[in-house]
């Protein structure tokens, strides 16, 4: 949900981020960018800056975008693996992005303007892909393991805390 209290949704088929007005249920285009591959997951910081993962599943590549209050998309990072899950640490200073096919999770520092720097590997797995991610208030990262049917919990230091097995295999 954005600072106006409206829901934002990635519309990967039409290269959009959509906004759903929670009062009227009206759907409008929040941001359209022809250079989007297939915007997939999004997260929003306390200032209302939107970060979007943008995979190209066929080519197994991806990008990261930032969308500011002007609703214009700015490419933050190209030439990545298949970007999918994306989330911010509770203080908004670290952006986590996973690459589903390559099974890597990256961490980036985030400045006040929403620019990213200091790209580093946060975690790597040898099997099964990823989908959505979210941080808890302590900064632990919860990562869905698509095809395995688990959610892993990783500490802010990158240590595996727990792996929770679910009933279904295609966890997102």
Segments predicted by a language model, with ranges:
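C-terminal closing repeat unit and adjoining cap/tail of repeat-based domains
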Residues: 148-172
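Short loop/turn segments immediately following the C-termini of beta-strands
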Residues: 12, 55-57, 100, 110, ...
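A short loop-to-beta-strand structural motif that recurs across blades of beta-propeller domains
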Residues: 16-18, 62-65, 104-106, 150-152
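Surface-exposed loop/turn positions within WD40 beta-propeller blades
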Residues: 4, 13-14, 24, 47, ...
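Anionic-ligand binding region
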Residues: 96-133
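Beta-rich, blade/repeat-based domains predominating
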Residues: 1-7, 11, 33-63, 76-94, ...
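Short loop/turn segments that connect beta-strands within beta-propeller blades
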Residues: 21-25, 67-71, 109-114, 154-159
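A short beta-strand motif characteristic of beta-propeller blades
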Residues: 26-33, 71-78, 117-124, 159-164
């Amino acid at each position: 949900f954005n600072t106006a209290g409206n829901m934002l949704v990635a519309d990967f088929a039409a290269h959009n981020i959509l906004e759903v007005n929670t009062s009227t249920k009206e759907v409008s285009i929040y941001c359209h960018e022809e250079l989007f591959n297939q915007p997939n997951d999004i997260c929003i910081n306390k200032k209302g800056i939107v970060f979007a993962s943008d995979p190209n599943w066929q080519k197994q590549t991806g990008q990261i975008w930032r969308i500011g209050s002007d609703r214009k998309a700015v490419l933050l990072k190209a030439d990545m693996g298949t970007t999918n899950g994306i989330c911010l640490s509770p203080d908004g200073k670290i952006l986590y992005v996973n690459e589903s096919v390559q099974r890597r999770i990256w961490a980036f520092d985030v400045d006040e303007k929403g620019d990213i720097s200091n790209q580093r590997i946060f975690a790597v797995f040898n099997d099964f892909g990823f989908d959505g991610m979210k941080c808890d208030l302590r900064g632990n990262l919860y990562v869905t393991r698509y095809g395995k049917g688990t959610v892993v919990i990783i500490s802010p230091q990158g240590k595996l805390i727990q792996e929770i097995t679910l009933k279904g295999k295609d966890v997102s």
